[in-house]
Amino acid sequence: MTSGATDFRSDRVGTALAGTNPTVLRRLRAGFAVIGDVQHLPGYCVLITDTPGADQLTDLPPERQLLFLEDMAILGRAVAAVCARRDPGLRRINLEIQGNTDAFLHAHVTPRYDWEPPEIVGWPAALHHWTGLMTGGEPPLLGPDHDELRRELGDEIDRQLAAVS
């Protein structure tokens, strides 16, 4: 993706705060909307915290917890709007806070589609790229062919933010 890919992947929160994380779409109120650097399902995004050291939602003060959850909903609406325009097979948006692999607060915002193979539909989307079932191998990495998607997502996030301001 970029020559600094290793750097941003090793500290996604720090690089977002420093303005050097290339996956950041927009700064939200309690975090950063980022496009997934692996696009196992088109439009996959993540909300990452803007609080260094916050490993889970309960690490934040209650008012920041609510802002993070509101930001997650904003990003979810933006992903839903963009993906529905781009693919009539959009079925739903999954919103998940897991954090079992990456030790920083983040929420997965994953579009789910009617065209997903039946053996995958009931699985958490994160398993798609681990198993290779969607592509028969490595999932598509974020690159220049995603520039238009990035632009659309950023514009829609702006619209969603304006609607709640």
Ranges and model annotations:
Residues 1-165:
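HIT superfamily nucleotide-processing domains
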